[in-house]
């Protein structure tokens, strides 16, 4: 299994330094959606990493694929959300509210 990355130049540079080769540097939501589609069509890719800000802009493209997509903060830090998506998933799956 390989890991694919879709991100801005700073994020992509970090993952390239870590040795990942399936990386897409994008500058627009359209480029990001196309990169996600290309990574999704590659059977060797099992995990796709992108930034939270890109993820918000291409939510429909991410929701339509079957691979695991992990959203990480970019250089501006994490996006503050009213509901933490991980807490919501745990609460729905287990019935326990994490504080």
UniProtKB/Swiss-Prot annotation:
Disulfide bonds: none annotated. GO terms for molecular function: ATP binding; proton-transporting ATP synthase activity, rotational mechanism; proton-transporting ATPase activity, rotational mechanism. It is found in: Cell membrane. InterPro entries: ATPase_V1-cplx_f_g_su, ATPase_V1-cplx_fsu_bac/arc, ATPase_V1_fsu_sf. GO terms for cellular component: plasma membrane. Component of the A-type ATP synthase that produces ATP from ADP in the presence of a proton gradient across the membrane. This is A-type ATP synthase subunit F. It comes from Methanococcus maripaludis (strain DSM 14266 / JCM 13030 / NBRC 101832 / S2 / LL).
